[in-house]
């Protein structure tokens, strides 16, 4: 069987203490079967979570497992491809009529200057506000400063990606950058600041709102978090 990557399996894998690669391989199967107390085959897992048993672990299977094990699945935002094709709720790139300004719940700084407001797409504004509020609650101001989570790199910017091949998610106002000085585009783990274990909760907070880290998913551009699936 060819194992495909599914975003829906990642929160399941994280909850089970596995590498969250989205690939429902043998380790994922073993951990799920142990939790569900069923035979270590996908047919048995699917039957245990009331999913039509075809033996192929796809999104429906992941959602069934999550429901059975009380694992919260994040909101599913549109894919990058649908955003760029103009088929998503985010509309056209560069449309500033879709943007709103929000006040960050803790002090942010852009190149040393205080940030009064952040401009993002109205569809993600509430999630951004809630995520940052949760960061403040979990880390507190002292740890936020120590980990440079108060260093803001921008959000809305009608531009192309670093490679210049397509529009950046920033052009829709659905991506934000943090601590760019220590998380440059080409910097990889473990050297990128936001790849450190101390930042695990930071990423868990964003991911709970359906946001995606390019660093965690592709190991580059660790500053970047976006509200669009890869």
Language-model regions: role of each:
Residues 1-79, 213-221:
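Short acidic, glycine/serine/threonine-rich helix-capping segments at coil-helix boundaries
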Residues 66, 129-136, 203-207:
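Non-transmembrane alpha-helical segments in soluble domains
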Residues 85-145:
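Active-site acidic/histidine clusters and adjacent loop/turn architecture
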Residues 132-174, 184-185, 212:
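Active-site-adjacent loop/helix surface patches within enzyme catalytic domains
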């Amino acid at each position: 069987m060819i194992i495909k990557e599914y975003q829906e399996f990642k929160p399941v894998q994280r909850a089970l203490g596995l590498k969250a690669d989205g690939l429902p391989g043998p380790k994922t199967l073993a951990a799920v079967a142990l939790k569900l107390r069923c035979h270590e085959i996908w047919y048995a897992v699917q039957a245990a979570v009331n999913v039509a048993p075809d033996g192929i672990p796809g999104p429906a299977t992941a959602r069934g497992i999550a429901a059975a094990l009380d694992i919260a699945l994040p909101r599913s935002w549109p894919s990058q491809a649908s955003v760029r094709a103009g088929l998503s709720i985010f509309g056209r790139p560069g449309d500033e009529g879709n943007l709103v300004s929000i006040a960050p719940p803790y002090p942010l700084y852009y190149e040393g200057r205080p940030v009064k407001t952040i401009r993002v797409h109205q569809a993600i504004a509430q999630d951004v506000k809630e995520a940052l509020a949760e960061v403040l609650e979990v880390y507190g101001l002292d740890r936020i400063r120590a980990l440079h989570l108060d260093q803001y790199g921008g959000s809305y910017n009608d531009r192309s990606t670093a490679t210049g091949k397509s529009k950046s998610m920033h052009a829709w106002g659905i991506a934000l950058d943090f601590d760019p000085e220590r998380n440059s585009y080409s910097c990889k783990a473990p050297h990128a600041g936001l790849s450190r274990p101390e930042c695990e909760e930071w990423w868990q907070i964003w991911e709970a709102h359906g946001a995606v880290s390019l660093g965690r998913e592709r190991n580059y551009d660790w500053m970047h978090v976006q509200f669009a699936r890869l």
